[in-house]
Curated annotation (Swiss-Prot):
GO molecular function terms noted in the UniProt entry: 4 iron, 4 sulfur cluster binding; aspartic acid methylthiotransferase activity; metal ion binding; protein methylthiotransferase activity
Name used for this protein in its record: Ribosomal protein uS12 methylthiotransferase RimO
Reaction(s) catalysed (UniProt annotation): L-aspartate(89)-[ribosomal protein uS12]-hydrogen + (sulfur carrier)-SH + AH2 + 2 S-adenosyl-L-methionine = 3-methylsulfanyl-L-aspartate(89)-[ribosomal protein uS12]-hydrogen + (sulfur carrier)-H + 5'-deoxyadenosine + L-methionine + A + S-adenosyl-L-homocysteine + 2 H(+)
Keyword Cytoplasm found: yes
């Protein structure tokens, strides 16, 4: 049994997996623990290790289990005295994790983020904790956060949960119903993030476009962005996870005229075959998706559109898949990611007939990615010679690197910069594009921006 020790003598490390929304949870947990007196470290030679897990699809679950098993080595042979699994995998399989991984000292569900200090203290006394209740956590106040990733970019989680009932998805089970955070709290949190050095605020949720629809004082994503754009120090505001049916004329008009709102929309479309979209439980069909993309491009000059697509959904035929490939070639999205359908227990799709064989899913995944790679390469090559504004993030060898308005952190490419003088990370420069691949650009710095 573990013996208790003083909080101020304890070092805590976090391994965070999955999406940026999960990353925010990890930053909040570390912030609460730091405020309580624990020392935060990036090294796994720590007294306490939290593994913040993902359980969206099978690959994510496997990665999370492997991460727990890897850190369990420190539980047996290193300094670690407490090992906890947090996040979506802990929410979904708490008893299985405790049964199958004896090195675990506890599991902490998605609804217990705000109680992490008490849970860690109990685990430090030797109690094997199982804290998994309804996924009801919501940041109703500005909570402390320990930043991860680039110091110049911060994620702002504007809501929790999801009310969309896509038939393949377990997120509503793991995160609960859709719950918007109060706009006043979000503005205060964004102000604090900017004061800490964030030049870019990235808004995330399971569905950002639904924001405010559940609040007593009805508000909207457009209203929230307008308030955030007035904050001092915020240069870019970026929107991810925009549900196609939730994109309003007001939001489009704001993006067209507000210079701080990146001309960038991440719109998960999932497929282009009406037959597959209906089977998925999606509400917007292919004709309307095409119409939306054409409208957005005409209304917002210079807009970058990113999307995500699933291949191998139950019943997807070769004709359905060819329709998706045709959509990619015709609509020429700037960015697109692809993943293979994962048969998740407890979802309606898992019980559907005509499950697509794994080898077919893999082959379709490769074909779709190859088509999009050539689309992206051609679009990037067409930008050679044009000018772009870049947020400088760091240096690699002789080159600096950063991102343009068209590049979201972690998921899109980079702009590699050649400069006649030293550049300061966290600043913006104007550059001319000199070369392009399917993902990254090369550019020559023309001037530094204020």
């Amino acid at each position: 049994m573990n013996s208790p020790w003083k909080a101020e003598a304890s070092r805590i490390a976090l391994v965070s997996l999955g999406c940026d929304k999960n990353r925010v949870d990890g930053e909040v947990m570390l912030g609460l623990l730091e405020r309580a007196g624990y020392q935060i470290t990036a090294e796994l030679e720590a007294d306490i290790i939290l593994v913040n897990t993902c359980a969206f699809i099978q690959d994510a679950k496997q990665e999370s289990i492997e991460a727990i098993l890897e850190t369990a080595r420190y539980r047996g042979n290193g300094r670690c005295r407490v090992l906890l699994a947090t996040g979506c995998l802990a929410q979904r399989y708490p008893d299985e994790l405790l049964r199958d991984i004896p090195e675990l000292d506890g599991v902490v569900g998605t609804g217990e983020v705000g109680r992490v200090v008490d849970i860690v203290r109990r685990a430090a006394t030797g109690e094997r904790v199982r804290e998994v209740g309804p996924p009801g956590f919501l940041g109703r106040e500005v909570l402390p956060r320990v930043p991860s990733g680039s110091p110049f970019t911060a994620y702002l989680k504007i809501s929790e949960g999801c009310d969309n009932r896509c038939l393949y998805c377990v997120i509503p089970q793991l995160r609960g119903p859709y719950r918007s955070r109060e706009a006043s709290v979000l503005v205060r949190e964004a102000r604090a993030l900017a004061a800490r050095g964030a030049r870019e605020i990235v808004l995330v949720a399971q569905d950002t476009t639904r924001y405010g629809s559940d609040l007593k004082e009805r508000t909207s994503l457009t209203d929230l962005v307008s308030r955030l754009a007035a904050l001092e120090g915020v240069a870019w505001i970026r929107l991810l996870y925009c549900y196609p049916s939730g994109i309003t004329f007001e939001l489009v008009e704001l993006m067209a005229r507000e210079p701080r709102l990146c001309r960038y929309l991440d719109i998960p479309l999932q497929h282009a075959s009406d037959r597959v979209l209906r089977r998925m439980g999606r509400s917007t069909m292919s004709y309307d998706l095409r119409k939306l993309i054409l409208f957005l491009r005409s209304a917002i000059p210079g807009l970058t559109i990113r999307s995500t697509f699933m291949v191998g959904f139950p019943g997807e035929t070769e004709a359905d898949f060819e329709e998706l490939l045709g959509f990619l070639k015709a609509m020429k999205l700037d960015r697109a990611g692809f993943f293979a359908y994962s048969r998740e227990e407890g979802t309606p799709a898992a019980r559907m007939p005509d499950q697509v064989p794994p080898e077919v899913k893999r082959e379709r995944l490769e074909r779709a990615a190859a088509v999009q790679r050539e689309v992206s390469r051609a679009l990037n090559r067409a930008r050679v010679g044009s000018e772009v504004t870049v947020l400088v993030e760091g240096r690699k060898g002789e080159q600096y690197y950063g991102r343009s308005e068209a590049d979201a952190p972690d998921i899109d490419g980079r702009v590699f910069l050649s400069a006649a003088s030293d550049l300061e990370p966290g600043t913006f420069v104007r550059a001319r594009i000199t070369g392009a691949g399917p993902y990254d650009l090369r550019a020559r710095v023309l001037s530094t921006l204020p």
